[in-house]
Every structure is written in structure tokens, then in C-alpha cells.
Amino acid sequence: MSVPRLGVGLQYNPELIGWFPFLDQPLDALEVLFDSVMGPLDGPGLISPRSADIVRDAVGSFPLLGHSNYGGDFGFDDLLSTAAALRHVPLAKQFGVSWVADHCFYSDGSWSDVWSSPLQFSRAEAARVAARARALQDLYGVPLAHENAAYYRTCPGSDLSEEEFLALTLELSGTYLHLDLHNLYANAQNHGASGYSIERFLDTIPLERIISIHMAGGRWIDGQYHDLHDTQVPEAVWDLLDEVLSRAQPGAVILEYETQALHADGATLDTERTTDLILADLERARQAWDRAYGPGSRRTTRDKVGSWTPS
């Protein structure tokens, strides 16, 4: 499957809509959270009525990428009964997305804490997940990329490392990797003492299967580091971006901001300051991309700085 080389973009998060000027930015791509815009499974509409205007504006402005958190992609319900098949697949086709990324957790009630509940890193689960991933990619008709998750503990029964599990799943499924660099950083903070290694992770995964990258920030709370997307990107994650861009050729780097402001606890929302911080991160990501691939390599700069042919 072909993957377009786009550049640097943002995730179109509902918590920012209304005060962050998405449509005024020279974005190379916009990532849409399918879970946030889809209509309920027990209703008649594909798109939630409250999201219709938002989606219409986005579709006409940028190349779109899809993202699934709660599609039940890797759970145990019949795949064709999941939100992924019933809502995310038709949304992907309607939006004309270049690819879809999904989170590597169960998201179907298998664990009580869905967000921080990783898949079981085992050979048996790699085979089961790969079969579902291959079938889901066929339904989408575009590349499906799996996002490495931030997690607080591994699933009981795991007999592989996270990176070994991902590499085996990709080998068996023929799907792709959506590399979240902040999730790598978060896991290293929380599990480094027990042997988690970013260097080993990057040396093990098939770098040629990376088609997109996530960048975000987070913070320490009560002795654990959390992937909250509520700060600017940490310096160590910028260093990881430079390293990965030197070793792989993704189609896009997407920045994520999930809370209403990048501010200290208890502070009042300052949209002007927060907008400036997000724009500063965007510009820094563009600079990293341009250092790696050249100033004419992004979608918004190719016509301005000549053509570019990926290797």
C-alpha cells in the first residue's frame, strides 16, 4: 500500500476546537479522532450532529488522517460488530483518509482501566491480533498503523517485550506502525528501573514500517509519569524525533494536545498563551522534518521550494 509523504500536522481534538485556530494554520495534515466525531452505534447517523460542522470544515481544508482509540479493534467481540467496523471504516472512506492509526489496547471492557491497559505481549496474542488487524486493514482499504501505548503495568501472561510483540504482529499482519514517541518516553520513565529501553525498542521494531509519529507532553503525578498531552513536548522527546527521522521515513509527524490549556494546576485558561505554545511546538517539528528531509519535502512547501522525491 502506498503512503503519501505529508509533513507536520495536528490532531483535531474537540477540546481545542472553538479557541485554537486550526483552519488558519499551514498544516501538512490533520488527524481526526474517529471516536470524537462518530454517531452512536444505536443511532442512525454516521457522524454525531454536534460534529457535523466541524468535520465539514476540516474535510475541505487539509489532507486527513484517521485515528481510533475505542474502536474495539483488538478486543474479543466479533470484528464486524465493533465501532471500528461500523463507524470508523465508513468514516475513513467518507473523509478519504490517507491511513488510519489505532491504539494497541483492548478498548472493549476486557480490562477495567481501558486507557492504560496494553495488549498481552505474547505470541498467541500477536497471532490473534494480527488476524484482526489484517482483516480490518482490508476493510479500510488504506494502511492501518498500530500505535504503541503508554501503560502502567504489563498484561498478565506476557512472554514477549513490547517491541518484540509489535514486530511479530506487523510481520504476521502486513500492517504498519504509528510510533508515539511520548509514549516511549513515558514508559521509560515508569518502567526504566525494570529494564525498559527505548534504544532496544527502536533497534527491534521494523523502522521501515513506521508511517506516522505522535508527539505530545505529560507530567509526573504521585510518583508516576502520565501521558496527559497537557504540556509542551519534552526535550528528550524532541531528541527522539531527530533520531527516528534519521532512521525512518514516516508520512507525517502529528502533535497532540488533549486538555484545554497548557497551564499549571488551578490556573485559568489562557488561550492566547496556549496557542503560542502549540504553534511553537509545530514550528519546531517543521524544523526537525526539514533538517531530516529538506525544506521542500512537506506538502505545504513543495510548490514553494521545488519538487521532492522520497527515496
Regions inferred by a protein language model and the residue ranges of each:
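Boundary/entry segment of secreted carbohydrate-active catalytic domains
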Residues: M1-F22
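Hydrophobic faces of well-ordered beta-strands that scaffold small-molecule active sites
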Residues: L6-Y12, D28-V32, L64-S68, V100-D102, ...
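Acidic (Asp/Glu)-rich catalytic clusters
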Residues: F20-P26, P44-G66, L80-S98, R134-L139, ...
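Active-site acidic/histidine proton-transfer and metal-coordination neighborhood
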Residues: S81-Y176
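Acidic/histidine-rich catalytic cores of soluble enzymes
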Residues: Q137-Q224
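C-terminal helical cap(s) of enzyme catalytic domains, especially alpha/beta-barrels
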Residues: A264-R298
